[in-house]
Design a protein with these regions (language model features):
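Alpha-helix-loop-beta-strand connector modules within alpha/beta enzyme cores
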Residues: 60-83, 113-120, 125, 182-208, ...
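Glycine/Thr-rich beta-alpha phosphate-binding loop at enzyme active sites
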Residues: 142-188, 230-237
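N-terminal amphipathic alpha-helix/helix-capping segment at the start of soluble metabolic enzymes
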Residues: 1-23, 113-127, 133
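Active-site mouth loops of central-metabolism enzymes
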Residues: 17-33, 79-81, 131-157, 202, ...
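Hydrophobic faces of well-ordered beta-strands that scaffold small-molecule active sites
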Residues: 19-23, 48-50, 75-77, 92-94, ...
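Conserved anion-binding
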Residues: 84-165
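Glycine-rich phosphate-binding active-site loops on the catalytic face of alpha/beta enzymes
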Residues: 49-55, 91, 95-106, 174-179, ...
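Active-site beta->alpha loop and helix N-cap motifs at the rims of alpha/beta catalytic domains
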Residues: 23, 27-37, 47-52, 70, ...
Length: 248
């Protein structure tokens, strides 16, 4: 297994920006996964996240093994529930939904996951997950039955992120949601980045190289691209190479 967290810390210390591609298992075609992974390997991606809000875990082992046969990038689980855990991945973002007050996503699912995790060698990276209002209801809202935080209340979001860090989370993830109409505000990214000392991940609603660069410049250490790549696997072509990931 490859440990990602030390690499993420090293990248943050060296101001090296990271890009993760989020793959929804419900939408993956195993027959065409080779072509998809080839696109990822040619992109600026440094990590692959696998998971979705409603996926029930069927064939997840097969999906991860197929990915690992075709890429050397670290593969981290991004689980919506404990059924989305497999020992075949390299690690897991062990999520705590800090923006909501549904006990299932604050602690219950984490407790349920313990017997499964104890049987694996997964690198477990505790992650404070904060859903931000994005202009429309997202799958995360529907599944978790929680409301996102106000996209204009930068100080409260920054306080929430800091609380997540003080609780012990190793990463903070600001999420606008899959297919979000609006990305996380740049001023909010800046406010959170200035308040916390752990690495900051930002995802949802980012649809262009400009959007990625703006998030980096605002303080994101890792940007997650999901729907944009899902809708267009040529998203990065003729646009970026791995050597062009910015160092603001």
């Amino acid at each position: 297994m490859r440990n990602s967290y030390p690499q993420i810390l090293e990248a943050k210390a060296g101001n090296q920006k990271l890009v993760a591609i989020l793959l929804d298992p419900d939408k993956l075609d195993l027959a065409g996964i080779g072509v998809l992974v080839a696109k990822i390997n040619e992109s600026p991606a440094t990590h692959i996240l696998v998971g979705g809000s409603s996926f029930e875990g069927s064939h997840l082992d097969e999906i991860i093994l197929s990915l690992k046969q075709k890429t050397t990038l670290p593969i981290l689980l991004f689980p919506g529930n404990p059924s989305q855990i497999t020992a075949e991945a390299d690690g897991i973002l062990f999520l705590q939904l800090l923006s909501g007050r549904n006990p299932d996503y604050l602690i219950e699912h984490q407790i349920d996951a313990v017997p499964v995790l104890e049987k694996t060698n997964l690198e477990i990276i505790s992650t404070g997950y904060i859903l931000i209002e994005s202009g429309s209801e997202t799958a995360v809202e529907r599944v978790t039955k929680t409301k996102p935080l106000d996209r204009n209340n930068f100080d409260y979001v920054a306080q929430t992120a800091k609380a997540g860090e003080l609780i012990g989370n190793k990463l903070i993830y600001l999420e606008a949601g899959s297919g979000a109409q609006q990305a996380v505000p740049l001023a909010m990214i800046k406010a959170v980045a200035e308040r916390i000392s752990v690495p900051l991940i930002v995802g949802g609603g980012i649809r262009s190289k400009t959007g990625i660069n703006e998030a980096f410049n605002a303080g994101a250490d890792m940007v997650v691209i999901g729907t944009a790549f899902e809708n267009d696997s040529a998203f990065f072509e003729n646009d970026w190479s791995k050597s062009q990931i910015p160092n603001p």
